[in-house]
Amino acid sequence: MNSYDFMGLTKKECQDLCEQRNLIFRLISKDGDIYLPYPEDRRTDRVCVELEAGKVTKVVLQ
């Protein structure tokens, strides 16, 4: 799994890709507004994303 696979995708495209790969999707922020903080626990099946102008601009695989 590579974080670059998710970069530039829309929220829906990212969610669909996560579902295809059996990963947990977590939206951290959208256009600078924080929705959820980054989790403190570590997992191998979670994708945390930040969106700007409708596209994924930051991905943290946890």
Q: Which residues are covered by each model-predicted region?
A:
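Exposed, flexible binding/inhibitory loops of compact, secreted disulfide-stabilized domains
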Residues: 1-62
